[in-house]
């Protein structure tokens, strides 16, 4: 059996990044975790001096249509200031983040997918060597032994064309096109932006809106594709 066939039989790691901060990565990660019955890991958490952190947010977010209780793994690094990891380290000089420190949690049974939520966007600096989120994604591809894919979360409204295309093209230029599941647009549905992005070759996985009722949650979960269908699509492409 070749390595590609072996990877296809393994549960994937899906890295969720965004076009900006506060675009809804944690909300979308929550939906994906419940849709796919996945585990969750936030490798680097910042801003814990004033916020409970995304792991707690995801844990406390109740999905009425789901009985799944996701395994949630502790961040490798948790920094106090609500800044990029590089900037947050300036306030904690004893912390020195290195890519080699990021190892897939041993507690992950690999019986289900693992959703990994990044900090900010693809160019956010993570280490003192100025390694960025994209470098972390590559590191996981090289070291995890599992197929690794990327989901980009973007706003649905005005300005998303520029931000989404910059992010998409950056990932493609860094050799990650074959790892891209696609983009999830978060916010009020905007079919014009969907069609415009498709013209540039961007795969739109779904549009999701903020859920205010259990019915809304059920509808959003139903609209999201299965991880198996996405992996099959990547194999065909």
UniProtKB/Swiss-Prot annotation:
Molecular function per GO: ATP binding; dethiobiotin synthase activity; magnesium ion binding
Q: Which CDD domains match?
A: DTBS (cd03109)
InterPro entries hit by this protein: DTB_synth_BioD, P-loop_NTPase
Which keywords does UniProt give here?
A: ATP-binding, Biotin biosynthesis, Ligase, Magnesium, Metal-binding, Nucleotide-binding
Copy the pathway line from the protein's UniProt record.
Answer: Cofactor biosynthesis; biotin biosynthesis; biotin from 7,8-diaminononanoate: step 1/2
Q: Which cofactor does it need?
A: Mg(2+)
Describe the reaction catalysed, as an equation. Answer: (7R,8S)-7,8-diammoniononanoate + CO2 + ATP = (4R,5S)-dethiobiotin + ADP + phosphate + 3 H(+)
The catalytic activity of this protein is classed by the Enzyme Commission as 6.3.3.3
Q: Where does ATP bind?
A: 22-27, 117-120, 184-185, 213-215, 220
The record places the active site at 42
For binding Mg(2+), which residues are annotated in this chain's numbering?
Answer: 26, 117
BP terms from Gene Ontology: biotin biosynthetic process
Q: What class of enzyme is it?
A: ligase
The job of this chain, per UniProt, is described as: Dethiobiotin synthetase involved in the biotin biosynthesis pathway.
Q: Which family does it belong to?
A: Belongs to the dethiobiotin synthetase family.
Extract the NCBIfam families matched here. bioD (TIGR00347)
Specify the protein name: Dethiobiotin synthetase
Q: Which organism is it from?
A: Saccharomyces cerevisiae (strain ATCC 204508 / S288c)
Query: Per UniProt, what is the name of the gene that codes for the protein in this document?
Result: BIO4
């Amino acid at each position: 059996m070749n390595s590609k066939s072996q990877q296809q039989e393994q549960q994937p790691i899906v890295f969720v990044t965004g076009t900006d901060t506060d675009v809804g990565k944690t909300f979308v990660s929550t939906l994906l975790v419940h849709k796919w019955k996945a585990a969750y890991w936030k490798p680097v958490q910042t801003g814990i001096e004033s916020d409970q952190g995304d792991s707690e947010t995801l844990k406390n977010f109740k999905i009425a249509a789901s009985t799944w209780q996701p395994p949630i793994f502790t961040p490798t690094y948790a920094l106090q200031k609500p800044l990029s990891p590089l900037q947050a380290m300036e306030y904690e000089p004893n912390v020195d983040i290195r890519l080699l420190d990021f190892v897939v949690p041993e507690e992950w049974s690999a019986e289900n997918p693992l959703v990994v939520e990044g900090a900010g966007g693809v160019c956010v600096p993570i280490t003192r060597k100025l390694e960025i989120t994209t470098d972390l994604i590559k590191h996981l591809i090289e070291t995890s032994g599992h197929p690794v894919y990327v989901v980009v979360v973007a706003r649905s409204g005005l300005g998303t064309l520029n931000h989404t295309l910059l992010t998409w093209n950056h990932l493609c230029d860094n050799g990650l096109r074959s790892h891209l599941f696609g983009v999830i647009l978060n916010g009020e549905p905007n079919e014009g932006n969907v069609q415009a992005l498709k013209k540039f070759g961007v795969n739109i996985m779904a549009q999701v809106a903020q859920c205010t009722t259990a019915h809304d949650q059920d509808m959003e979960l139903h609209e999201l594709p299965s991880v198996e269908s996405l992996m099959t699509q990547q194999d065909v492409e």
